[in-house]
């Protein structure tokens, strides 16, 4: 039981546990229902009941009396196995979970939440997958995506590598949406893959009528059977439940806090439009299935700073990172790739110390061009690495990966300027900007 403080004492005073049926009386209303657990960080002034009509309510306890009606057991989900024989005519797709909204199912009777990443769980929630591929599923870990770290990128890459090595024809990675584009970029650099690797998630949980989880999973499995052998992100194309877009893993970004079509290709077109029934190629320039040998380069350097330029930013911010031993810096600059000229001397110091400093743009659309204005030219003279049309988050991830491959500052500069996974376009088309 996760209840703490006053709420816990309130329940314990009547020998009540999670799962028990209770009567709660307040001065003007009486409730009967099952006691549900709460999050660890919830306040201690309320308890949660599941009423007979299926709704969950919070009850403030300061003026309440509680009575045990019937002992129960803590809500849990017990599901029968799924009878599904492998179809030798279908491809084999592995689905691995790192956590997030898409990675759970909910028991509407009890309110219990269950991590949903055995093959049985996936097929029970999405029986349509049986028409697309043979499915195997497992959880690598279960964390909120805001708690992702570079070490988890490595663990995810190794898990995907293992699935492909074991014969998977495609891999789907279920991930929380907040930092999915960081992890998709990381695996784009770490893996050379002969098969599709598709990231997906959900903006809205499966207990909501507007959930996007089912379509995203189905379309992702379909994409994992395609000929696009790259690391990609597959999420809703529009607010409607019609199709998903397949985005290159280094050219995608979460662009809205809550919309189901939050993920957008930036400085690029989506690679494909996907439905559970098929895939329509939108961009012909992609790595084809079987064109690369499987390869894993998973060393990363975590001591990389990601710094946003803003009016009044102090040079001490960069100096602090240098004093703390950071090995690389990525600046999210303004406009064409600028920052206040007060930063230029300390950026020059970083360059002289062998710490590469890369420049991206907060504009997201378009590309860095540091030859237009004097500030940009002075930054180039100080040793800044221009990142063309690379997204800021991708440049940060790439710097972590590059510095895991080399200690040589000049080699790091060359690698940052090299188009390794489709993160840099030779030119930026007006077709890429939606406005």
From Swiss-Prot:
Heterodimer of GatD and GatE. Pfam families: Asparaginase, Asparaginase_C, GatD_N. Keywords: ATP-binding, Ligase, Nucleotide-binding, Protein biosynthesis. The gene is gatD. It is an enzyme of class 6 (ligase). The keyword Ligase applies. Belongs to the asparaginase 1 family. GatD subfamily. Residues 91-419 form the Asparaginase/glutaminase domain. GO terms for biological process: amino acid metabolic process; regulation of translational fidelity; translation. It catalyses: L-glutamyl-tRNA(Gln) + L-glutamine + ATP + H2O = L-glutaminyl-tRNA(Gln) + L-glutamate + ADP + phosphate + H(+). The active site is at residues 101, 177-178, 254. Allows the formation of correctly charged Gln-tRNA(Gln) through the transamidation of misacylated Glu-tRNA(Gln) in organisms which lack glutaminyl-tRNA synthetase. The reaction takes place in the presence of glutamine and ATP through an activated gamma-phospho-Glu-tRNA(Gln). The GatDE system is specific for glutamate and does not act on aspartate. One of its GO terms (molecular function) is glutaminyl-tRNA synthase (glutamine-hydrolyzing) activity. It comes from the Archaea. This is Glutamyl-tRNA(Gln) amidotransferase subunit D. InterPro entries: AsnA_fam, Asp/glu_Ase-like_sf, Asparaginase/glutaminase-like, Asparaginase/glutaminase_AS1, Asparaginase/glutaminase_AS2, Asparaginase_C, GatD, GatD_N. Its EC number is 6.3.5.-.
């Amino acid at each position: 039981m996760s209840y703490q403080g006053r709420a816990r004492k309130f329940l314990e005073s009547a020998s009540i546990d999670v799962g028990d049926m209770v009567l709660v009386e307040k001065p003007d209303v009486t409730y009967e229902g099952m006691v549900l657990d709460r999050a660890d960080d919830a306040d201690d002034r309320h308890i949660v009941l599941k009423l007979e009509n299926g709704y969950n309510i919070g009850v403030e306890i300061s003026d309440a009396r509680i009575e045990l009606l019937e002992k129960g057991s803590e809500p849990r989900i017990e599901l029968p196995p799924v009878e599904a024989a492998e179809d030798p005519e279908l491809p084999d797709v592995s689905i691995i979970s790192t956590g997030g909204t898409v990675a759970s199912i909910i028991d509407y009777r009890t309110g219990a939440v269950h991590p949903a990443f055995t093959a049985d769980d996936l097929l029970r929630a999405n029986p349509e997958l049986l028409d697309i591929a043979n499915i195997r599923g497992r959880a690598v870990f279960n964390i909120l995506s805001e708690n992702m770290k570079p070490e988890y990128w490595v663990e995810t890459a190794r898990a995907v590598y293992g699935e492909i090595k074991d014969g998977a024809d495609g891999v789907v990675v279920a991930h929380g949406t907040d930092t999915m584009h960081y992890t998709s970029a990381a695996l784009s650099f770490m893996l050379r893959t002969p098969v599709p690797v598709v990231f997906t998630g959900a903006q809205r949980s499966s207990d909501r009528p507007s959930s996007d989880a089912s379509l995203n999973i189905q379309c992702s499995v379909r994409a994992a059977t395609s000929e696009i052998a790259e690391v990609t992100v597959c999420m809703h194309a529009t607010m409607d439940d019609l199709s998903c877009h397949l985005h290159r893993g280094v050219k995608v970004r979460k662009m809205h806090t809550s919309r189901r079509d939050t993920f957008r290709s930036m400085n690029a077109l989506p690679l494909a439009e996907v439905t559970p029934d098929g895939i329509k190629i939108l961009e012909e320039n992609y790595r084809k299935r079987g064109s690369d040998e499987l390869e894993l380069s998973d060393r990363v350097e975590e001591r990389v700073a990601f710094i946003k330029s803003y009016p009044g930013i102090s040079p001490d911010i960069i100096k602090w990172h240098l004093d703390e031993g950071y090995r690389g810096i990525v600046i999210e600059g303004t406009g064409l790739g600028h920052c206040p000229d007060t930063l230029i001397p300390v950026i020059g110091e970083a360059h002289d110390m062998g710490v590469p400093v890369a420049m991206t743009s907060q504009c997201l659309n378009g590309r860095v061009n540091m030859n237009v204005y004097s500030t940009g030219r002075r930054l180039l003279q100080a040793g800044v690495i221009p990142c063309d049309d690379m997204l800021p988050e991708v440049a940060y991830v790439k710097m972590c990966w590059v510095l895991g491959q080399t200690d040589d500052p000049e080699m790091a500069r060359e690698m940052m300027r090299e188009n390794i996974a489709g993160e840099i376009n030779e030119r930026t088309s007006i077709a890429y900007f939606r406005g």
